[in-house]
């Protein structure tokens, strides 16, 4: 009998038992089905007995008993009465936890509208009824009447009538028509809607509509109608007759001491609903006047609104404490809501946290665990061990032993801990290396010991950081921890494949000191027969570490030092000696570790790292390097350099006073002078670092003394500090920036050793404070960026080996400003070839398609002279719901092909987000010293070769130099075989000093230009005439107050004017340019005229100058917002106008206050209106490519997509994002950015639905679109047409297929409302959905591929089964 009753109750679903989850509107029948009884009274619990009031909000009869297996009145106790319903109090005898899942309901006296569907944007109810939210609300809140059935009156259905109009109609038509107010009236209208007919009508209207605005509006409505039609939801379910009541345990009432109660806000909200509902019932029974009833109904509607969503209402209901009450919606949304607080961020049992201290004596796979902590964490295991060994017979006894901390307990703990890894985590966990597994070693004290080499990965230091420890319990968890998460298995960074376990600080300093050379050290010049002899001599103190010696290695003599031979002892055999026969800085050590890892494997690397750490610390200790004030030597030439600079500044000031230069130019020049002098002082300081007062040294001696200067060694080895910081200590601090980013033109000439004057100190504080303020703000921003990135990419895994696509992307070396910033071999490392590669000279195949490129192959490809490769990429991968292994390439963290199930989306997001946080924390290290990049105004050849010109349009000046007259002009330097070696862009107006075909040496000047102004240059000679120059309208005479000289500056002028400089020929006619157009040069606002009427000019002369903006300092502050802007695909504020076709530029007058630029292509012409005052960067007669900007400004990514297509856009986004990171010296592999870009471009917008079920303007997943089209074509129908879409990451994350994931990200209520109306099914494909549902995530070892893998328990001696609940109860 009891079994049958027990089976009536729903058992909690096992998360593995279902594969998808659907959300839809609840019908009134469904709500009644959920409910265990009606809540009729607003009372909660009896204040004297503390027992719940019957029929109240905590009623035990409805929701279940308060104590396990016990009814309320106490007639039935114990488990034997399971399932009995008490005849006295009506409570069922069952576990009290049913109070967490049993719901009640409230029968409403009048229907109410659900606020989510009324108030959401766009309002769902409004769209269905074709009413505005305003009208709808007036009806629902009983202000206006709505016509339900017009009968045979001239009224129309859904007409809105005010109180007076309604009375008028009643007197006119009597009861021929039907109108009503409130949710009842709305429900009747919703019931009348025939979805099929309305949908058909709308489709016809959309076909007939002419304007896109109307089409869009109708489509919006059609979408909602279709959603209701396809989902099986009825529109009238948006109006509620019955309100479900949450189980009482989820809205608890907790007694505090002192007889007061802490209650969940929901209880107050429910109480108001019940009170008003009961009052309304009573009023209706008493047949109260309609006004009173109407008011009560409105109040009921409002109270239900507040219960469901208190934030959507204009006036949120406040508690007594003036804070808004937390409604049901507030419970689920936001950081403190159900999703993010309880489902995605659970607390974990078997965990502890403590301060970390350094443990240099540990091996790399170990961590020190405090004894007391370990005992607590491994308690169950210790109990088991004590029983096993016979020290205790029951758990209770074992407990007692542990509490007494007897000696056998510690022995048991030692044994338990053997081979049982623990996880260490340091918050914030910015990438997956923030949690790693270690073998615990018991230590005294209360601090966790951490190996110094893993600090980089955790970003930990020992200034009070804390870390958390977690214990993996099951065999499976232990195996995963050991195989996948062990610190020795994570030597490479997933972001770029470089070693992340690189020695830092002291270790670097020690190794660097060990490998230095000192020519007068003891034993210098000695010759040894083998390394053993050297070590013996060193141990006998016959030679010093730094002595340069000769040693016979592999049969030949090598010049080296004693220290390097000592270092050779710890390096694996087989590493070429030349790799370590040099001063080993941090960078060199990184290369060495990478080499060892690549050639000798993980095991040797770890052994080497362990030895390296011990040796580094040892030597650093012996060296006795420290900082002393005399180490900061102030250069003797400093005063004279500063005097010289002051003289130059005076000269610039004089030129300004005479009116030769403008204020802006003066400022820029002064900044430049000081930036240069700071550099020179720094150079002098570096030269003289080793000097002592009153002693003379030869330059050679000085160089050696300098190389042993403590501060120099710290910076040079890469241990701590930089040359820039030494400069501030001993050179001069240099230019500082204001908080706004402008540079203050008086620099700080003092350094920290001399000390600063109060004024200098005050100027310094700007930068220092801004640095600290920025850090705080930007950490939050970077964290938010990471969160958005993870959310957009969390459902991308590796699903299959090969998607079979033939597509790929082309990759070349990245060149910026003539310099290769990223060589080809770095860019192709870890990628898969998309086609066979042939040697350009011999034609033999170097590698077949689908080969993964490792370091050796990358080198081979580059050496063969190939400079452009087609590789496979995630951007072109055809795998649905994921990516294939071939397109992704190598798993950078393990340098082998990536495995199926790898969560590459999350790895990509972490790789991009983690340095964002890092960078933002690093803005203030130079204390705001302005690091202005000295404007490059001279171009020098880097190597030797032959000069070639590439699309240069120029005129020759009298002196034989050439002046460039177009943009995208280039100078190329080729080697003897005609291969391009260097490539330089030239700016408009640059002066070329070399001739085409000339052979140049490295360092030779090629061209120069003015870095501060953009000139306007004449192409022909002649006499100057000015047009439309009206003072005060198109230009103003600016008289410089300091100089008394005047010049003409063009100002923002009315559209009818076109100020210009015209060149006249001998006859006084307007001369013609070689292209045939008239020689007129339009002057933009801000231009400063250099010529005057009647002047005679030669070809190549400057007519006017446009000053460039004054310089601001560059810093990732510009960087992080820039990265966010690119990922969010925002349209830039000052977007450049871009040419849509290839063609020749023509200037054509102006219209409506804008200049008109025409681009003439081969078969089409495009006109562009340029707003006045914008600086045009193309010139008449220039040839522009599609996608090139015509005016200054950032390019709008959406226009790249439209003009150049998706491939170009993808390349642009990847390159632009990489640029920002590269500026900060952060290396991220392209593939990570590609993964995110793939997600941003996964949707298409339907332009023409054809015969498919799509609607115009629908945003559909690319794969679904292709699939649907294939089906339609197979049926012989017309396929849909669509254009690719670029979504920002926030929008892409919200438009994911999974509603659970989207709701837990942002805008929870909107996502849930939309999903419920469509009755969306979540297939639980991504990580987040599965974490929320409490399932194993479908990535890594949880992948469907490994579903049936079992782990054999024999490897582990421990038996965990001992700890099921029953065994504890029995004892």
Swiss-Prot record:
Q: Does the keyword Iron apply?
A: no
Report the SMART domains cross-referenced here: RPOLA_N
Binding of Zn(2+) 1 occurs at 71, 73, 86, 89
Q: What are the protein's GO molecular function terms?
A: DNA binding; DNA-directed RNA polymerase activity; magnesium ion binding; zinc ion binding
Pfam families noted in UniProt: RNA_pol_Rpb1_1, RNA_pol_Rpb1_2, RNA_pol_Rpb1_3, RNA_pol_Rpb1_4, RNA_pol_Rpb1_5
Q: What class of enzyme is it?
A: transferase
- Reaction(s) catalyzed by this protein? RNA(n) + a ribonucleoside 5'-triphosphate = RNA(n+1) + diphosphate
Cysteine-cysteine disulfides: none
Task: Give the note describing cofactor binding and stoichiometry.
Answer: Binds 1 Mg(2+) ion per subunit. Binds 2 Zn(2+) ions per subunit.
Query: What EC number(s) would the UniProt record show?
Result: 2.7.7.6
Positions contributing to Mg(2+) binding: 461, 463, 465
Q: Tell me, which GO biological process terms does this entry list?
A: DNA-templated transcription
- What cofactor does this one take? Mg(2+); Zn(2+)
Quaternary data: The RNAP catalytic core consists of 2 alpha, 1 beta, 1 beta' and 1 omega subunit. When a sigma factor is associated with the core the holoenzyme is formed, which can initiate transcription.
Cross-referenced HAMAP family: RNApol_bact_RpoC (MF_01322)
Task: Give the family, as the similarity comment puts it.
Answer: Belongs to the RNA polymerase beta' chain family.
Name under which the protein is recorded = DNA-directed RNA polymerase subunit beta'
**What's the source species for this entry?**
Thermodesulfovibrio yellowstonii (strain ATCC 51303 / DSM 11347 / YP87)
Q: Which gene encodes it?
A: rpoC
């Amino acid at each position: 009998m009891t079994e049958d009753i027990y089976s009536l109750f729903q058992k909690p679903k096992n998360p593995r038992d279902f594969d998808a989850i659907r959300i839809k509107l609840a019908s009134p029948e469904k709500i009644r089905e959920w409910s265990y009884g009606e809540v009729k009274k607003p009372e909660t619990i009896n204040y004297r007995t503390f027992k719940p009031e019957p029929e109240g909000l905590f009623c035990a009869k409805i929701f279940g008993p308060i104590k396990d297996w016990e009814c309320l009145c106490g007639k039935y106790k114990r488990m034997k009465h399971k399932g009995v319903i008490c005849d006295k109090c009506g409570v069922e005898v069952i576990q009290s936890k049913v109070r967490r899942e049993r719901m009640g309901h409230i029968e409403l006296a009048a229907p109410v509208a659900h606020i989510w569907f009324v108030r959401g944007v766009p309002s769902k109810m409004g769209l269905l009824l074709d009413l505005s939210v305003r009208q709808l609300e007036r009806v629902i809140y009983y202000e206006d009447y709505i016509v339900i059935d017009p009968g045979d009156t001239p009224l129309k259905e859904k007409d809105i009538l005010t109180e007076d109009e309604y009375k008028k109609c009643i007197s006119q038509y009597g009861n021929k028509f039907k109108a009503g107010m409130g949710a009842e009236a709305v429900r009747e209208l919703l019931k009348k809607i025939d979805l099929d007919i309305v949908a058909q009508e709308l489709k016809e209207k959309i076909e007939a509509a002419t304007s896109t605005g109307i089409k869009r509006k109708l489509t919006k409505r059609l979408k909602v109608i279709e959603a209701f039609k396809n989902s099986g939801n009825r529109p009238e379910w948006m109006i509620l007759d019955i309100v479900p009541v949450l189980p009482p345990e989820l809205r608890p009432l907790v007694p505090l001491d002192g007889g007061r109660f802490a209650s969940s806000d929901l209880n107050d909200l429910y109480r108001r609903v019940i009170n008003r509902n009961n009052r309304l019932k009573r009023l209706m029974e008493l047949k109260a006047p309609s006004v009173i009833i109407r008011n009560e109904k409105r109040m009921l509607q409002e109270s239900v609104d507040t219960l469901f969503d208190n934030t959507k209402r204009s006036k949120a209901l406040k508690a007594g404490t003036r804070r808004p009450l937390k409604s049901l919606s507030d419970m689920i949304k936001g950081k403190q809501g159900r999703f993010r607080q309880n489902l995605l961020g659970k607390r974990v049992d078997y965990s502890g946290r403590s301060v970390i201290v350094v443990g240099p004596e540990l091996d790399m796979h170990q961590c020190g665990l405090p004894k007391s902590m370990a005992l607590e964490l491994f308690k169950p295991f210790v109990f088991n061990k004590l029983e096993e060994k016979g020290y205790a017979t029951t758990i209770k006894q074992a407990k007692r032993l542990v509490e007494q901390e007897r000696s056998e307990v510690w022995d048991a703990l030692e044994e338990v801990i053997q081979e049982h890894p623990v996880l260490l985590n340091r918050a914030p966990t910015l990438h997956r290396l923030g949690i790693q597994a270690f073998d615990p070693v018991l230590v005294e004290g209360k601090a966790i010991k951490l190996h110094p080499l893993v600090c980089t990965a955790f970003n930990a230091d020992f200034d009070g950081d804390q870390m958390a420890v977690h214990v993996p319990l099951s065999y499976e968890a232990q195996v995963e921890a050991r195989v996948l998460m062990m610190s020795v298995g994570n030597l490479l960074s997933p972001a770029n494949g470089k070693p992340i376990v690189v020695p830092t600080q002291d270790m670097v300093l020690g190794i660097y000191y060990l490998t230095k050379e000192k020519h007068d050290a003891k034993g210098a010049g000695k010759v040894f027969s083998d390394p053993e002899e050297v070590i013996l001599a060193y141990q006998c103190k016959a030679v010093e570490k730094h002595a340069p010696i000769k040693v016979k290695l592999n049969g030949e003599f090598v010049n080296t030092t004693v220290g390097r031979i000592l270092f050779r002892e710890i390096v694996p055999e087989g590493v070429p000696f030349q790799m370590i026969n040099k001063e080993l800085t941090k960078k060199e050590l990184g290369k060495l570790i990478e080499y060892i890892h690549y050639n000798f494997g993980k095991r040797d690397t770890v052994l080497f790292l362990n030895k390296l750490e011990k040796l580094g610390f040892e030597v650093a200790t012996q060296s006795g390097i420290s900082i002393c004030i005399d180490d900061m030597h102030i250069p003797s030439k400093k005063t004279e350099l500063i005097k010289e600079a002051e003289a130059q500044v005076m000269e610039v000031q004089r030129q300004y006073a005479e009116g030769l230069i403008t204020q802006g130019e003066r400022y820029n020049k002064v900044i430049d002078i000081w930036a240069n002098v700071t550099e020179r002082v720094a150079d002098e300081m570096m030269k003289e670092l080793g000097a002592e007062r009153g002693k003379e040294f030869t330059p050679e001696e000085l160089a050696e003394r300098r190389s042993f200067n403590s501060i120099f060694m710290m910076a040079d080895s890469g241990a701590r500090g930089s040359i820039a910081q030494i400069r501030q200590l001993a050179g001069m601090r240099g230019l500082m920036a204001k908080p706004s980013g402008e540079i203050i033109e008086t620099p700080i000439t003092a350094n920290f050793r001399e000390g600063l004057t109060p004024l200098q100190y005050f100027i310094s504080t700007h930068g220092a404070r801004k640095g600290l303020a920025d850090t705080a703000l930007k950490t939050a921003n970077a964290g938010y960026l990471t969160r958005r990135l993870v959310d957009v990419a969390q459902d991308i895994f590796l699903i299959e080996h090969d998607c079979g696509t033939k597509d790929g992307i082309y990759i070349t070396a990245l060149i910026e400003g003539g310099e290769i910033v990223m060589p080809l071999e770095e860019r192709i490392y870890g990628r898969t070839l998309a086609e066979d590669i042939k040697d350009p000279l011999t034609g033999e195949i170097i590698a077949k398609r689908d080969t993964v490129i490792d370091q050796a192959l990358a080198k081979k490809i580059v050496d063969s002279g190939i400079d452009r490769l087609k590789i496979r990429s995630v951007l072109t991968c055809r795998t649905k719901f994921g990516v294939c292994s071939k397109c992704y390439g190598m798993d950078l963290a393990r340098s082998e092909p990536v495995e199926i199930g790898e969560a590459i989306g999350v790895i990509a997001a972490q790789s991009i987000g983690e340095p964002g946080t890092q960078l933002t924390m690093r803005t203030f290290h130079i204390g705001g010293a302005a690091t202005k990049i000295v404007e490059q105004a001279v171009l020098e050849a880097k190597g030797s070769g032959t000069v070639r010109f590439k699309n240069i349009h120029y005129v020759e000046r009298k002196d034989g130099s050439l002046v460039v007259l177009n943009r995208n002009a280039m100078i190329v330097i080729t080697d003897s075989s005609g291969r391009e070696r260097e490539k330089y862009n030239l700016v408009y107006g640059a002066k070329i000093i070399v001739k085409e075909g000339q052979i140049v040496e490295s360092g030779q000047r090629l061209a120069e230009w003015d870095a501060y102004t953009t000139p306007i240059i004449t192409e022909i000679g002649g006499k100057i005439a000015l047009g439309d120059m009206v003072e005060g309208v198109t230009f103003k005479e600016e008289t410089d107050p300091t100089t008394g000289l005047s010049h003409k500056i063009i100002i923002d002028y009315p559209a009818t004017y076109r100020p210009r400089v015209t060149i006249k020929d001998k006859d006084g006619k307007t001369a013609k340019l070689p292209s045939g157009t008239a020689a007129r040069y339009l002057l933009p606002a801000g231009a400063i005229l250099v010529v005057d009427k009647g002047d005679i000019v030669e070809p190549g002369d400057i007519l006017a100058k446009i000053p460039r903006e004054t310089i601001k300092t560059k810093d990732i502050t510009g960087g992080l917002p820039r990265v966010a802007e690119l990922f969010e695909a925002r349209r830039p504020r000052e977007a450049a106008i871009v040419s849509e076709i290839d063609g020749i530029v023509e200037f054509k007058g102006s219209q409506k206050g804008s200049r008109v630029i025409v681009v003439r292509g081969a078969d089409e012409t495009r006109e562009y209106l340029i707003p006045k005052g914008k600086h045009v960067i193309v010139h008449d007669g220039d040839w522009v490519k599609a996608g090139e900007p015509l005016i200054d400004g950032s390019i709008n990514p959406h226009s790249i997509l439209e003009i150049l297509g998706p491939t170009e856009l993808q390349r642009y986004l990847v390159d632009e994002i990489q640029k920002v990171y590269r500026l900060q010296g952060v290396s991220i592999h392209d593939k990570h950015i590609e993964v995110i870009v793939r997600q941003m471009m996964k949707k298409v917008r339907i332009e023409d639905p054809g015969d498919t079920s799509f609607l115009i303007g629908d945003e559909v997943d690319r794969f679904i679109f292709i699939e649907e089209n294939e089906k339609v074509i197979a049926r012989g129908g017309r396929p849909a047409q669509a254009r690719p879409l670029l979504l920002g990451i926030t929008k892409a994350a919200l438009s994911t297929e999974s509603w659970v994931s989207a709701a837990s990200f942002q805008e929870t209520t909107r996502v849930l409302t939309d999903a419920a109306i469509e009755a969306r099914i979540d297939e639980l494909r991504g990580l987040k959905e599965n974490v929320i549902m409490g399932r194993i995530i479908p990535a890594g070892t949880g992948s469907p591929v490994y579903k049936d893998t079992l782990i054999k328990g024999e490897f582990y001696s421990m038996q965990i089964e001992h700890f099921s609940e029953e065994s504890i109860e029995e004892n």
